[in-house]
From Swiss-Prot:
Enzyme Commission designation: 3.1.-.-
Binding site for Mn(2+) 1: 41, 108, 119-120
Species classification: Viruses, Riboviria, Orthornavirae, Negarnaviricota, Polyploviricotina
Cofactor section: Mn(2+)
Name of this chain's protein: Polymerase acidic protein
Any Gene Ontology CC annotation: host cell nucleus
Protein family: Belongs to the influenza viruses PA family.
Species for this entry: Influenza A virus (strain A/England/878/1969 H3N2)
Record text on cofactor binding: Binds 2 manganese ions per subunit.
Record: residues binding Mn(2+) 2: 80, 108
Keyword Protease: no
Lineage top rank: taxon: Viruses
Protein's GO biological process: cap snatching; DNA-templated transcription; symbiont-mediated suppression of host gene expression; symbiont-mediated suppression of host mRNA transcription via inhibition of RNA polymerase II activity; viral RNA genome replication; viral translational frameshifting
Length: 716
C-alpha cells in the first residue's frame, strides 16, 4: 500500500501526510491504510479549492491555471495540511477579519464567498452514516459539511453542494480512479474495511465491574446512571441559555447572565488616603554604592573585609545628625546605632587581624531597634482555658493609602540600563544536556539585553542580602551580627567591582517555623534628600552622615550623603524566596520565548535572530494614560524582567489577591475584544473582590492604575 500511495499521489501531498502522521505519533509503515486515507483527503481538499476564484464584483468564477487572470483572489483558504499551530493561527485570523464564529475543531477549508468554514469528508462507507457522524462530532451550524464517497455519492449540509457540477465531477472521478487502482492491486478490500467512524475514545471504552459501580456512585444529584449523565452532557449546548443551564445544575444557583459590552466595565476604584510608602526590604533607585574596582586586598571575598575596604574609599564622613525623624520611633536610638557601627568598625581596623564576622555589642539602642524583650510572653493555651475574658489582641484595620508617583518612578528606573554588567552568561544555568542550538541562542540574546539592567542589579542584591541574612540567622542565633550589604559586578571594560550599599544588624533568630520572624535594622547609603518626598520614607529615620564630591562634565560638586535607617523583619520562607530571585530571569525569558514562538509559527520558521536583531521594529510594552507604550525588543525584555522582580520585591497577600481577581476581569475584556460576546453574572462581586485587595501596597496600587489605563484603551 505504501508503494501505491507514493506512486499514485503528488509528492507534496505524500510529504504533508507523513508530517501529519508523525505529529500524531503514528507509523505510516504500519498504518498504511490510514496513510492512503490522509493522502486521499488532502487531495480532495486541494481539488475542491483548485481553479476557484472571486472576481472584483465578488462573484465566484472558475479559472484554469494558464489563464492570465489567475491573480484573482482565491475563493477558498486551505486549512487542512498545515501543522496545528499554523492552522489555528489561520483560523483565528479568519475569525478576526470576517467575524466568523471560531470552530471547536479544525475545519478543512474556509469559503470567502459564502463566509463559512467547510469540513470535507471522504468515506468508504455509506455517505449518510458518515455525514451524521461528522455532524454529531462538530455540533455546529456554522461549519458546512460536504461528504464524498468512492462510489460517486455525495452529501452536504442542507443539500448545498457549494461547487458547480463539473468541479464535483472531477473529484468523484479521481476518487473512482483511486478505487479502481487499489482494486487492481488487491488493496481495496483491506482499505474499505479499515475505515473507522468518527467515534471518540469514550464511546469505544467500556467501563465495567468496580469502575462502573464507582462511576454510578460518583454522579451529580438527579442522575440515576452513567448513561443518563452522558446523554445530558452530550446534549449540553455551550452557547445555549446559560441561566437555564445553571438552574439545571443546582437548585441553589440563581444567576442572571448580563451581556458584557464596551460600556459595561467601570474603572477600578483606587483608595483615597495619605500617599503610600516604600516597603521594600532594601533601597532601590535611591541606593548609593561605595565601590572598589579590581579588588585584590587581603581577605578579598570575605564580606567584612570587602566592606571595610569600600568604607575606606570615602573621605567625607562627618558628625551624623537626624534630618527626617521616624514619627513613631525613638530616633536618637537610630542615630546611636549608626555611631556604634562606625565605632565598632574602627575597633576592628585597630586589631591585628580582622575577624571574618562581627557581632555587635548588645547596647540599649540596638536592643530597642531589634525589639529585644518586646515580644509578649507565650503561654500554653491549655493553661488559659479558665480565664473568662480571654480574647485575641484587637488589631486595627490597615489604613488605606493612595497611589503615589514614586512607585512608577521606581519601576521606570528598574527598566533602565546601568553602566555595569550584573550577570555573567552562566547565571541562568549551564547547559546540562546537549540543548538545541536555538535555545542557547535565545538565552544569549536575552542575557545581552538584560545583563546591564537595573532590575538585574536588584536581583543580585536581593540574592546576596537574603543569603547572608539566612546564613547568619542559622549560624549566630543569639548574636546581633553585622552583615554588610554587598553586590559584585563588572564594568563595561570587564573589570571586577565590589559594591557596599550599607549594613544590616540582625536580631535574635531562633527560627523554628518557616514564618517565624527575625528582626533586623538596615542602614543604607543614599544621595536622595528624604525631605523631597517625606511620605515615601514614613518608615525610615534618615541621617545626614557626610558630603560626597561628585564629578561631572561641568566640574565637581558636593552633595550631602544620607543614611536611611529602619527596623524591619523577615522570615525563613521570605529569605528562601529572596535567595531564588534569579528565577525572575527565567520567568521573563519564558515570556519573551512565547512571543518568539508566536511569531515563528506565523512565519513558519524560527524568528529568534530577526526578533532580536531587527532594531527598527517596536513591540507593545504596556498601557499608560497616553495609550499603548511601545519600545525595542530590549526594552520589552527589561520591562518584563522588572515586573517579575517587583513581584518578588513587593510580594504580598494584596498582590496575590489582586492578580487572581483582576485576571478574571482581564479575560472577559479580552473575550470582548475578540468579539466572543462574553456574558457575566455578579460583576459587582468581582469588582468588590478586586478592590478589597487595594489597601496600601504601592506595587498593587500601581498595577491597578495600569489596569485602568488598559480598560480605557481596550474598550475604545
Amino acid at each position: 500500500m505504501e508503494d501505491f500511495v507514493r506512486q499514485c499521489f503528488n509528492p507534496m501531498i505524500v510529504e504533508l501526510a507523513e508530517k501529519a502522521m508523525k505529529e500524531y505519533g503514528e507509523d505510516l509503515k504500519i498504518e498504511t491504510n490510514k496513510f492512503a486515507a490522509i493522502c486521499t483527503h488532502l487531495e480532495v481538499c486541494f481539488m475542491y479549492s483548485d481553479f476557484h476564484f472571486i472576481n472584483e464584483q465578488g462573484e465566484s468564477i472558475v479559472v484554469e491555471l494558464d489563464d492570465p487572470n489567475a491573480l484573482l483572489k482565491h475563493r477558498f483558504e486551505i486549512i487542512e495540511g498545515r501543522d496545528r499551530t499554523m492552522a489555528w493561527t489561520v483560523v483565528n485570523s479568519i475569525c478576526n477579519t470576517t467575524g466568523a464564529e471560531k470552530p471547536k475543531f479544525l475545519p478543512d477549508l474556509y469559503d470567502y464567498k459564502e463566509n463559512r468554514f467547510i469540513e470535507i469528508g471522504v468515506t468508504r462507507r455509506e455517505v449518510h452514516i458518515y455525514y451524521l457522524e461528522k455532524a454529531n462530532k462538530i455540533k455546529s451550524e456554522n461549519t458546512h459539511i460536504h461528504i464524498f464517497s468512492f462510489t460517486g455519492e455525495e452529501m452536504a449540509t442542507k443539500a448545498d453542494y457549494t461547487l458547480d457540477e463539473e468541479s464535483r465531477a472531477r473529484i468523484k472521478t479521481r476518487l473512482f480512479t483511486i478505487r479502481q487502482e487499489m482494486a487492481n492491486r488487491g488493496l481495496w478490500d483491506s482499505f474499505r474495511q479499515s475505515e473507522r467512524g468518527e467515534e471518540t475514545i469514550e464511546e469505544r471504552f467500556e467501563i465495567t465491574g468496580t469502575m462502573r459501580r464507582l462511576a454510578d456512585q460518583s454522579l451529580p444529584p438527579n442522575f440515576s446512571c452513567l448513561e443518563n449523565f452522558r446523554a445530558y452532557v452530550d446534549g449540553f449546548e455551550p452557547n445555549g441559555c446559560i441561566e437555564g443551564k445553571l438552574s439545571q445544575m443546582s437548585k441553589e444557583v440563581n444567576a442572571r447572565i448580563e451581556p458584557f459590552l464596551k460600556t459595561t466595565p467601570r474603572p477600578i476604584r483606587l483608595p483615597d488616603g495619605p500617599p503610600c510608602f516604600q516597603r521594600s526590604k532594601f533601597l532601590l533607585m535611591d541606593a548609593l554604592k561605595l565601590s572598589i574596582e579590581d579588588p585584590s586586598h587581603e581577605g578579598e571575598g570575605i564580606p567584612l573585609y570587602d566592606a571595610i575596604k569600600c568604607m575606606r574609599t570615602f573621605f567625607g564622613w562627618k558628625e551624623p545628625y537626624i534630618v527626617k525623624p521616624h514619627e513613631k520611633g525613638i530616633n536618637p536610638n537610630y542615630l546611636l546605632s549608626w555611631k556604634q557601627v562606625l565605632a565598632e568598625l574602627q575597633d576592628i581596623e585597630n586589631e591585628e587581624k580582622i575577624p571574618r564576622t562581627k557581632n555587635m555589642k548588645k547596647t540599649s539602642q540596638l536592643k530597642w531597634a531589634l525589639g529585644e524583650n518586646m515580644a509578649p510572653e507565650k503561654v500554653d493555651f491549655d493553661n488559659c482555658r479558665d480565664i473568662s475574658d480571654l480574647k485575641q489582641y484587637d488589631s486595627d484595620e490597615p489604613e488605606l493609602r493612595s497611589l503615589s508617583s514614586w512607585i512608577q518612578n521606581e519601576f521606570n528606573k528598574a527598566c533602565e540600563l546601568t553602566d555595569s554588567i550584573w550577570i555573567e552568561l552562566d547565571e541562568i544555568g549551564e547547559d546540562v544536556a546537549p540543548i538545541e542550538y536555538i535555545a542557547s541562542m535565545r538565552r544569549n540574546y536575552f542575557t545581552a539585553e538584560v545583563s546591564h539592567c537595573r532590575a538585574t542589579e536588584y536581583i543580585m542584591k536581593g540574592v546576596y542580602i537574603n543569603t547572608a541574612l539566612l546564613n547568619a540567622s542559622c549560624a549566630a542565633m543569639d548574636d546581633f551580627q553585622l552583615i554588610p550589604m554587598i553586590s559584585k559586578c563588572r564594568t563595561k571594560e570587564g573589570r571586577r567591582k565590589t559594591n557596599l550599599y550599607g549594613f544590616i544588624i540582625k536580631g535574635r533568630s531562633h527560627l523554628r517555623n518557616d514564618t517565624d520572624v527575625v528582626n533586623f535594622v538596615s542602614m543604607e547609603f543614599s544621595l536622595t534628600d528624604p525631605r523631597l518626598e517625606p511620605h515615601k520614607w514614613e518608615k525610615y529615620c534618615v541621617l545626614e552622615i557626610g558630603d560626597m564630591i561628585l564629578r561631572s562634565a561641568i566640574g565637581q560638586m558636593s552633595r550631602p550623603m544620607f543614611l536611611y535607617v529602619r527596623t524591619n523583619g523577615t522570615s525563613k520562607i521570605k529569605m528562601k524566596w529572596g535567595m531564588e530571585m534569579r528565577r525572575c530571569l527565567l520567568q521573563s525569558l519564558q515570556q519573551i520565548e512565547s512571543m518568539i514562538e508566536a511569531e515563528s509559527s506565523v512565519k513558519e520558521k524560527d524568528m529568534t535572530k530577526e526578533f532580536f536583531e531587527n532594531k527598527s521594529e517596536t513591540w507593545p510594552i504596556g498601557e499608560s494614560p497616553k495609550g499603548v507604550e511601545e519600545g525595542s525588543i530590549g526594552k520589552v525584555c527589561r520591562t518584563l524582567l522588572a515586573k517579575s522582580v517587583f513581584n518578588s520585591l513587593y510580594a504580598s497577600p494584596q498582590l496575590e489577591g489582586f492578580s487572581a481577581e483582576s485576571r478574571k476581569l482581564l479575560l472577559v475584556v479580552q473575550a470582548l475584544r475578540d468579539n466572543l460576546e462574553p456574558g457575566t453574572f455578579d460583576l459587582g462581586g468581582l469588582y468588590e473582590a478586586i478592590e478589597e485587595c487595594l489597601i496600601n501596597d504601592p506595587w498593587v496600587l500601581l498595577n491597578a492604575s495600569w489596569f485602568n489605563s488598559f480598560l480605557t484603551h481596550a474598550l475604545r
